[in-house]
């Protein structure tokens, strides 16, 4: 068993979430949560004992909320909601995302507002700790009432239904439960609804995208700096005085990153007093562009940290007052809007990088050989690699269309406005693939551009990146099979090898 962390319900930070997932820590629930969970469950039991009618406990669901269910059918009701709602489709979510969904659901239920038993939460913890991941199709949620469909698939294995994945292999839920030391559960009142109501899938998809996007942000700062040197660009636009008087802290921070990366470049010193007055915007305005990107990522991070600890169940149990209240915390509008903002940021990262690639291959702008290859004509060089980048950038622009402005009524118009948070977050992963492709091509193009400046060198910091690229992709002295080179650099990007923190610590 891996090392464990003690989960303090409602106190997850983005840093702790990353650590838990990266280090594959197992989960132990803080003991002080036990009484909160017990009191919440007792409140639900009291409703049943007193024969009160409360939504989600002894009624139907959605537009069937006005139908009262008899006491002897309550367990069947909870089983039925899981089975009937498990109707997702599409590719299965990756294990890393499912692990995060489990963690968020455990964190949600453990705060004592859902009325479930500790036994149910412990079963989820066992799945998480033994890396038994329910098979969750990626499509089917509209982000209100929560992520009903994918969370139903998350819950199926607890009943002994459906399939799970363990060590990359799809196996039956029955086998998975044995691996986790569990037997199928019989759900009690409200437990099925509590499992299904919530925004943990939308939040997990958005969080996992944010974590990778932070890596792409750093890579784009590095690749953009390399492009400045390869194109004989100026570092004057990164002067701190320019950015201080605009006042945006994220822009000020971004400009500092460019200054630090370019400091000490022999290439820059060789043309410091040349006649070129101003660079194209894709070089000159990088702090303004990437500062705006950083600002959006910071906003998204703040939003998702709150949501990671938020109670998005319905109805909600307030055990201290003995109240069970119906509300709308399951509506994912804030997640959808955060995901839309992150989509804009990803599109701008890729779009500005594509423009720099176009600049580098154009001899009239960069002063480098056409398409970054000698004997152009005989060789096409980076001509079509740029086309691939353009294709990905264009794809991102379509994917960046806001999902939060969309809504389709469901459940016979009872759920008449929905957030589309899940699809808003899910499409980010396709944008990440596109953006990492574009950045890989820019890194290759910029490093190729540096070849034509030899014996002059780029800065010591950027030379580390150049050497890292050249460790897996040699210089293009003539045309060759290009696609594998892009994939090699994409892997380095996604493995976080092009990190500003790594450069700083070396």
UniProtKB/Swiss-Prot annotation:
Give the matching Pfam families.
Answer: Lyase_aromatic
- Subcellular localization: Cytoplasm
Q: Which organism is it from?
A: Legionella pneumophila (strain Paris)
Q: Which GO terms describe its cellular component?
A: cytoplasm
Return the PROSITE patterns for the record: PAL_HISTIDASE
> Which keywords appear in this protein's UniProt record, sorted alphabetically?
Cytoplasm, Histidine metabolism, Lyase
Q: Molecular function terms in GO for this entry? A: histidine ammonia-lyase activity
Coiled-coil residues: none
Q: Which reaction does it catalyse?
A: L-histidine = trans-urocanate + NH4(+)
The signal peptide stretch is none
**InterPro entries for this protein:** Aromatic_Lyase, Fumarase/histidase_N, HutH, L-Aspartase-like, Phe/His_NH3-lyase_AS
Gene Ontology biological process: L-histidine catabolic process to glutamate and formamide; L-histidine catabolic process to glutamate and formate
First-tier enzyme category under EC:
lyase
Q: Where are the transmembrane segments?
A: none
Specify the pathway.
Amino-acid degradation; L-histidine degradation into L-glutamate; N-formimidoyl-L-glutamate from L-histidine: step 1/3
**What protein name is recorded for this chain?**
Histidine ammonia-lyase
What family is it from?
Belongs to the PAL/histidase family.
Disulphide bonds in the chain: none
Q: Does the keyword Acetylation apply?
A: no
Keyword check for Lipid metabolism: no
Q: Which location does the Swiss-Prot or TrEMBL entry give for the cross-link 5-imidazolinone (Ala-Gly)?
A: 144-146
- Positions of modified residues (2,3-didehydroalanine (Ser)): 145
Q: What processing steps or modifications follow its translation?
A: Contains an active site 4-methylidene-imidazol-5-one (MIO), which is formed autocatalytically by cyclization and dehydration of residues Ala-Ser-Gly.
Q: What is its EC number?
A: 4.3.1.3
């Amino acid at each position: 068993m891996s090392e464990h962390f003690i989960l303090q319900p409602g106190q997850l930070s983005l840093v702790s979430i990353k650590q838990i997932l990266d280090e594959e820590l197992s989960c132990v629930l803080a003991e002080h949560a036990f009484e909160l969970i017990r009191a919440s469950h007792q409140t639900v039991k009291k409703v049943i004992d007193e024969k009160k009618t409360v939504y989600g406990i002894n009624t139907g669901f959605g537009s069937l909320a006005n139908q009262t269910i008899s006491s002897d059918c309550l367990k069947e009701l909870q089983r039925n909601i899981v089975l009937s709602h498990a109707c997702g489709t599409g590719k299965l979510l990756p294990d890393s995302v499912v692990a995060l969904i489990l963690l968020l659901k455990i964190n949600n239920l453990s705060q004592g507002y859902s009325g479930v038993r500790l036994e149910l939460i412990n079963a989820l913890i066992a799945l998480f700790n033994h890396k038994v991941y329910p098979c969750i199709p990626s499509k089917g949620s509209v982000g209100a009432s929560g992520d009903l469909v994918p969370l139903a698939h998350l819950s199926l294995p607890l009943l002994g239904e459906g399939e799970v994945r363990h060590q990359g292999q799809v196996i039956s839920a029955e086998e998975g439960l044995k691996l986790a030391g569990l037997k199928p559960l019989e759900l009690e009142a409200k437990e099925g609804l509590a499992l299904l109501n919530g925004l943990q899938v939308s939040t997990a998809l958005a969080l996992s995208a944010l974590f990778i996007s932070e890596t792409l942000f750093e890579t784009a700062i590095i690749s953009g700096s390399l492009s400045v040197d390869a194109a004989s660009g100026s570092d004057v636009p990164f002067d701190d005085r320019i950015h201080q008087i605009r006042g945006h802290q994220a822009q000020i921070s971004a400009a500092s990153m460019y200054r630090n990366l370019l400091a000490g470049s022999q290439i820059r010193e060789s043309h410091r007093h040349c006649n070129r007055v101003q660079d194209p915007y894709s070089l000159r305005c990088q702090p303004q562009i990437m500062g705006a990107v950083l600002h959006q990522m910071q906003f998204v991070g703040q939003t998702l940290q709150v949501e990671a600890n938020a109670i998005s169940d319905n109805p909600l149990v307030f055990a201290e007052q003995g109240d069970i209240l119906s509300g709308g915390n399951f509506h994912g509008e804030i997640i959808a809007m955060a995901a839309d903002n992150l989509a804009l940021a990803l599109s701008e990262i890729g779009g500005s990088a594509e423009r720099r690639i176009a600049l580098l291959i154009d001899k009239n702008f960069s002063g480098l050989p056409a398409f970054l290859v000698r004997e152009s004509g005989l060789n096409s060089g980076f001509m079509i690699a740029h086309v691939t980048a353009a294709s990905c950038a264009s794809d991102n622009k379509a994917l960046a269309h806001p999902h939060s402005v969309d809504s389709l009524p469901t459940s016979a118009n009872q759920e008449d406005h929905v957030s589309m948070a899940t699809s808003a977050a899910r499409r980010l992963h396709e944008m990440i693939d596109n953006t990492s492709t574009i950045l890989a091509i820019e890194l290759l193009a910029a490093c190729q551009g540096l070849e034509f400046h030899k014996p002059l060198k780029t800065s010591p910091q950027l030379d580390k990146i150049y050497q890292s690229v050249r460790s897996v992709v040699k210089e293009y002295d003539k045309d060759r099979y290009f696609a594998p080179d892009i994939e090699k650099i994409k892997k380095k990007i996604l493995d976080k090898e092009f990190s500003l923190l790594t450069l700083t610590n070396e």
